[in-house]
């Protein structure tokens, strides 16, 4: 039992250090019931000098009460990633599947907003894709942004 607890602590600690954190930088009210568009800044933890801004819809309590869906926010998100300083690429996943940079729950257990980074080696470009992942069904809602690696420092 002790080894399982140690393994769980190591896995949780590793996962929590790999995922970026979001910092809210904007909030736009869209109606009288309190629904908002939230804008977060997310720095890529393995690529210094790249920041992604993600906008998503945050439902108000009144909207949740009137629609009867208490525990879920919409999956829609928009992403824009830019160079915000000298780019220094760390040890990133180079596979076609890419690497998760950020994850945030959009419901109690079934849905999350995720940002993945994929490296396009032929074009020396980082591709960031924001998408919803649902336990019960897939979602076609996605948004991408690219950051070209002009004069970037790559990990050895």
What is the meaning of each model-derived region?
Residues 8-16:
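Bacterial N-terminal signal peptides
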Residues 23-45:
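Extracellular/luminal recognition modules and glycoprotein regions
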Residues 37, 50, 79, 126:
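Residue-level detector of short, conserved catalytic/binding motifs and their immediate flanks
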Residues 122-156:
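C-terminal partner/receptor-binding element of secreted or periplasmic proteins
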Residues 17-22:
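Sec/Tat signal peptide C-region and signal peptidase I cleavage site
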Residues 51-120:
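Mature extracytoplasmic domains of secretory-pathway proteins
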Residues 1-8:
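Bacterial N-terminal signal peptides that target proteins for export
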């Amino acid at each position: 039992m002790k080894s399982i607890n140690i393994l769980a602590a190591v896995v949780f600690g590793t996962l929590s250090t790999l995922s970026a954190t979001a910092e809210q930088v904007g909030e736009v009210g869209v109606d009288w019931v309190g629904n908002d568009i939230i804008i977060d800044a997310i720095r890529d933890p393995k690529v210094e000098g790249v920041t992604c801004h993600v906008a998503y819809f945050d439902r108000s309590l009144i909207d949740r009460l009137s629609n009867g869906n208490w525990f879920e926010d919409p999956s829609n998100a928009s992403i824009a990633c830019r160079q915000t300083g000298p780019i220094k690429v760390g040890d990133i996943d180079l596979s076609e599947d890419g690497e998760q940079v950020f994850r945030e729950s959009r419901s109690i257990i079934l849905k999350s907003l995720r940002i993945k980074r994929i490296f396009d080696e032929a074009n020396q470009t980082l591709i960031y894709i924001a998408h919803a992942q649902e336990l019960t069904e897939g979602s076609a809602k996605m948004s991408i942004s690219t950051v070209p690696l002009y004069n970037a420092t790559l990990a050895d």
